[in-house]
Amino acid sequence: MALNLSHQLGVLAGTPIKSGEMTDSSLLSISPPSARMMTPKAMNRNYKAHGTDPSPPMSPILGATRADLSVACKAFAVENGIGTIEEQRTYREGGIGGKKEGGGGVPVFVMMPLDSVTMGNTVNRRKAMKASLQALKSAGVEGIMIDVWWGLVEKESPGTYNWGGYNELLELAKKLGLKVQAVMSFHQCGGNVGDSVTIPLPQWVVEEVDKDPDLAYTDQWGRRNHEYISLGADTLPVLKGRTPVQCYADFMRAFRDNFKHLLGETIVEIQVGMGPAGELRYPSYPEQEGTWKFPGIGAFQCYDKYSLSSLKAAAETYGKPEWGSTGPTDAGHYNNWPEDTQFFKKEGGGWNSEYGDFFLSWYSQMLLDHGERILSSAKSIFENMGVKISVKIAGIHWHYGTRSHAPELTAGYYNTRFRDGYLPIAQMLARHNAIFNFTCIEMRDHEQPQDALCAPEKLVNQVALATLAAEVPLAGENALPRYDDYAHEQILKASALNLDQNNEGEPREMCAFTYLRMNPELFQADNWGKFVAFVKKMGEGRDSHRCREEVEREAEHFVHVTQPLVQEAAVALTH
């Protein structure tokens, strides 16, 4: 799951991809910029490519992230004299994403610890897990989010799946009446903010990457990133005779077959991992070994031989074969800022030239095609199983106020001052009835470094408008752990989706919010009281007229009554 400072992605708006089987030619269909339409509202349409064509590129400047969830929102009871609250909340299947009848509130899920299942395929800290889940249930949360790690389940050999600890953990959730968002985590754990443990890719996959290093994402300096298999190899039988996409599909099919009895009742959502930190993006800002530090612009990740082969073919199809040998090498280094570089600078930057449009269109379309392939498999595998499919998009809010939006571009989201990079993603998800899950919901613009022109609130607003236009449900997560009322208030505000363009005032809220994360800090008395009040307020929805003080008084009484249970959870997790 996404743990980074906050990531989001975007993509290009090229020719729509037909759902179903992808072909090699679909990777190469890049039309000249004049043949593509500009994006929807809120974006400047006076686009003109100008400035010098950076071809040949300059040398780099070195510098210092249900078909129907009908049961996803059941009633919960608060015992010990506090009364019972009945709320029926459901994910919306289609239409205007997240729209509900009468503003019925936003269900809250809580992310489980990354190491909830051990490397030995058992439940980690079993006693702590049970006490913690009981506490969460008593607080009124809808359910939990669990990483189902590829590197744990299919660790030993291809096609051999050990569901060990997951069987026990999911049965415990069922027993307690908690719903589950299961994340198909095809990435490595370790190397991102908040990654407290290391869970590598399956050993047999690592062996194949060792034999063929080009299976790893690669930057222009030859640095390899092993968090996730390069999308350039998606359709090649490079993993013991199977393609990466086939491996992901086989894993999801095995999960479905093993947990069929829980799908639709306990397991209500399948979040499909599509990149580093489980997000649909390139690993453009890797934090391992200090390669990238916030708020650097990151670097393009398309220099493995498979991606370069696709770029070469795309350039030939476009009629500019000289553009096919490399990506822009004047785009700076990981920790540069946009104005440090020729490619991303405001005036005359290569991003705003014909070459820049060609490259960024190809780069972002490769990411869209990757998502389309995996979603097509997921949709067919989980069809009629009563679960909703979701995809996580990173909240990349730094340098959002610049013209080029450099960090979004290197991550694969073709989002600039003149182009909406999130609508194409939303449209792709809409074709598969999937949920658009977005991070950095808790952040406010003024909390972030203003010299880096960070704007998480404006970014969330843009994404909300894109999902509204595409009629796709929007869900949210906080990017960093927060326990304060100020962050909770921002989440409440963002989840209400109060947009000026909101279809004549029709009620629309996020379909769900997932809170990062369950840990000892959450169960500290002060934090727990604020969290309980937050969950209550989220459940009441936008139409609630109760003041926060009233909700907090209820929460205080609740915390007092359930104190022994919460203390047990805190102590057990600490040890």
Curated annotation (Swiss-Prot):
Listed name of the protein: Beta-amylase 1, chloroplastic
Effect of C454S: Normal redox inactivation under oxidizing conditions
Gene source species: Arabidopsis thaliana (Mouse-ear cress)
pH dependence (UniProt free text): Optimum pH is 6-8.
Catalytic residues identified in the record: E279 (proton donor), E477 (proton acceptor)
Binding site for substrate: D147, H187, D195, K392, H397, T439, N478, A479, R517
Record keywords, A-Z: Carbohydrate metabolism, Chloroplast, Disulfide bond, Glycosidase, Hydrolase, Phosphoprotein, Plastid, Polysaccharide degradation, Transit peptide
Organ and tissue specificity: Expressed in leaves, roots, flowers, pollen, and seeds.
Family matches, as Gene3D superfamilies: Glycosidases
